[in-house]
């Protein structure tokens, strides 16, 4: 699937250009100067635009190009606190100038040739209080955005949310995570935030049946980007006992990563299509995770009887009322992450250039001691591993004192983090200042860097 943000900006950003002049070392190099000379104003402006256009899900040659751009920016000097503050504003302005949704109301096709990527826009489109992604049910050969929109749109409007109802790109059993749909959903979220000026702290995922699976799974994969989740009559992927067919475990990458995300999971015991045992097991595992790691304080399992495969008593409005007050916990002191996506390189303030599938990370921030501790358990998945790091800035830790960073109990960094433009840019692709950081500390011994 081709990525969606491939539209060059039509004009240079004049405020950005003015800021570039303030950076030292930006005179145009002569032909005799080495290739490592800092980029000049015009080149830097173009590099920033190109990087942001490549987006937060870049893979393959697109990610390689982003890394090349970061390498060019590494020739620039460190930033002062004042320069960092100015760059934050200008990078946000640059992100906001990227395209919004192709159409901002009604029933639409995102891709025209061939026609695919159907999405419906509804709810409150003028100054919304939040963004709802409403996820339809279905399976192999079935699934229709038009089936969920009538059930959710009115309830979303009453919460003063703008609502997007996407249709999976391929109608499979796991349509919300197959065939590029997951990346497309993130693009839709970012474009909707630009189109409707939505607060990044108020993005909600909800879905019914397979859409409940989508809310569980995308919500876990991108827990750092959502305020709350409301799956109904659908659960995460179970691992089944071969002899009995009963669920014995939940697929990796879900329960651990949800530590800091509010959820209200709805299930009817008599559901003939999605048996209650999967969500019952998931709720049990959440309780076990809470005992192990803490957190999960706003997880609710709402089980009734007699509703079959329908919505909860009171419909979507009753479900949304239970999540409406939540805002994203954007910078938690404790993080648990079990990565499953090669292109998900940032999770809160953790960074992993090549995340190891199924590995388990626990990270803890001690602000009083100005210390970050990370522990890592190897995963059962394939590949990945290099590039593990933590992002920091002067709001997360105290830049006036030495920062200590530990990996598996061993000190890997002790000193003053450096404010760098390349890290501000790397963490600006989602246009979210709470996920934007000015320093990056590799989780490897300093002598090995």
Language-model features and meaning:
Residues 338-449:
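C-terminal beta-sandwich/jelly-roll accessory domains of carbohydrate-active enzymes
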Residues 32-130, 411-413, 418-432, 448-449:
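A domain-start/cap signature at the N-terminus of enzymes
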Residues 138, 168, 269-272, 306-308:
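Acidic beta-to-alpha connecting loop that harbors the catalytic carboxylate
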Residues 125-175, 238-239:
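Short substrate-entry loop that stabilizes the transition state in hydrolases
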Residues 176-197:
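Alpha/beta-hydrolase active-site loop
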Residues 272, 276-381:
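C-terminal catalytic histidine-bearing segment of alpha/beta-hydrolase fold enzymes
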